[in-house]
Amino acid sequence: MNKVVVKNVTFGEGAPKICVPMVGKTVAALKEEAEMLQTIDLDVVEWRVDFFEDVKDLAKVEAALDEIRTILPETPILFTFRSAKEGGELAVSDEFYFELNETLARTGKVDLVDVELFNEEADVLRLIETAHKNNVKVVMSNHDFDKTPAKEEIVSRLIRMEALGADLPKIAVMPKSAGDVLTLLDATNTVSEKANQPIITMSMAGTGVISRLAGEVFGSAMTFGAAKKASAPGQIDVNELRHVLDLLHKQF
């Protein structure tokens, strides 16, 4: 499997890397969050820009990013606009979604960009090309807040993401039962054994918490923890998350 190196973080080896979302609505709130995150043992910060009140003003988005980057100069930043259809805060046009992501990828100030799989393929490929030209890695994602698809469908989506050029394919699903969590873990194990790229998977809500902890066993390279406000159901406090990941890593 290829390793994916972003600043001082290597995905695809050792314990899953911890990503903590920033969800501030204003520049002041984002600066406060970034200063708090300086004190926390994390690997990646995800800026959930769909929470930002001025997201439709690209100059203000870049200015906010500058403020975050000043406070967190060495921390890998994942730039994510989560669309409303995949559980995000704001519905925007496809045109704006791609303009926002391409513009920010070109700045060279983010390290990774989230690209949702279920968009026009030509647009997805263009954004991946723009990101890679600017040395930005691509997390390609899909989120199902209603259900857990069949194992074959989860595997198929992750393999498709890799085929399109994702550096880190990602899928998050909602379990209705413990069996659904096993389906996600089984799919993760299957893909991680044959994929070229590290993958990121999770089963959400309380039932799925085990999937956020057991990535090193089943093959998920990153997990999401909450420092202030969870951006998805089931996220664990980042300090507790690190403790459990370290415990499992020592035994593995």
From Swiss-Prot:
Residues the entry annotates as binding 3-dehydroquinate: E46, W47, R48, R82, R212, S231, Q235
Keywords (A to Z) from UniProt: Amino-acid biosynthesis, Aromatic amino acid biosynthesis, Lyase, Schiff base
Pathway of action: Metabolic intermediate biosynthesis; chorismate biosynthesis; chorismate from D-erythrose 4-phosphate and phosphoenolpyruvate: step 3/7
UniProt GO MF annotations: 3-dehydroquinate dehydratase activity
Positions of the catalytic residues: H143, K170
Catalysed reactions listed for this entry: 3-dehydroquinate = 3-dehydroshikimate + H2O
EC number: 4.2.1.10
SUPFAM superfamilies membership: Aldolase
PANTHER family: 3-DEHYDROQUINATE DEHYDRATASE
Its job: Involved in the third step of the chorismate pathway, which leads to the biosynthesis of aromatic amino acids. Catalyzes the cis-dehydration of 3-dehydroquinate (DHQ) and introduces the first double bond of the aromatic ring to yield 3-dehydroshikimate.
Family to which the UniProt record says this protein belongs: Belongs to the type-I 3-dehydroquinase family.
HAMAP family: AroD
Protein name stated in the entry: 3-dehydroquinate dehydratase
Organism lineage string: Bacteria, Bacillati, Bacillota, Bacilli, Bacillales
